[in-house]
A protein has these predicted regions:
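Sec-dependent bacterial lipoprotein signal peptides
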Residues: 1-16
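Lipid interaction determinants
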Residues: 18-77, 83-136
């Protein structure tokens, strides 16, 4: 009698330990290190950035005021998901999620178009940009 009860309790504990939310989808092609540059002649302030998308659903993006990436503006960290051509970025401490349409130009180049910007972002203009994989 005790053995079935222990098995049942163990199974219940195991199931309770599982997340009730499914794992968030991550487009595996986006994992890794990337670099981008905002258009110097575009509607928004010029800057460059390095971004890192990790398999644990975390991202880090460092923004620089120069092409050489020596004058750091700021670094943002947060969570990301990406699937079906949409990349969602939620920066730590910011309630609004930024959403981008994306498409691969080739295995190491991704084109993004902003469709939902963070209201605290430096530029609210719709814009597109390209990121290039680093170190491959």
């Amino acid at each position: 009698m005790l053995k079935p009860l222990l098995i049942g309790a163990s199974l219940a504990a195991l199931l309770a330990g599982c997340s009730s939310h499914p794992a968030q989808p991550l487009d595996q092609r986006l994992l890794g290190e990337w670099q981008g540059t905002r258009d110097k002649n575009g509607p928004c302030q010029f800057f460059t950035w390095n971004s890192s998308f990790r398999a644990d659903g975390r991202f880090e993006i460092s923004f620089f005021a120069d092409e050489q990436r020596t004058r750091l503006i700021q670094t943002e960290r947060g969570t990301w998901t990406a699937h079906y051509g949409k990349n969602h970025l939620t920066t730590d401490g910011v309630k609004t999620t930024e959403v981008y349409d994306y498409r691969f130009v080739d295995a190491d180049t991704v084109e993004y178009v902003s469709i939902k910007a963070d209201p605290t972002a430096d530029c609210q203009a719709d814009y597109r940009f390209t990121e290039h994989r680093v170190g491959r």
